[in-house]
Amino acid sequence: MTLEGLIKPEFDPNLPIYLQIMNFVKKLIVRGILKPGDKVPSVRDMALFLGVNPNTVQKAYEELEREGTIFTRRGQGNFVSEDENIVDKIKERMVKDLIEKYRKELEELGLSKGEIFNLLKEMLE
């Protein structure tokens, strides 16, 4: 997989970069740019593309492997999990995380869960 033509993410200074790299790779999988079994860009290539230290990319890849999103073939590199449900699993987790983030922010604004639910329902109709 080549990184050519991809839009480089803008990093949020309030979040660890390795977590943002993990999310970038997950979005590539969810969008179908990386498919189950595809080779993930090398640590070096990803670091050059993103303009970050290779150790940061390595940490992100290690965490992605720990959670089962990618796996390593010794001497060949990193690959997207061959689990056919990986895209759905990643998408579901990312959606839940986003909903939880905004739910917390809305509650901090004083909205109840019922009010949040009604607003969301209203927006989707």
Predicted ranges, named:
Residues 18, 42, 76-93:
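Short, cationic-aromatic polyanion-contact patches
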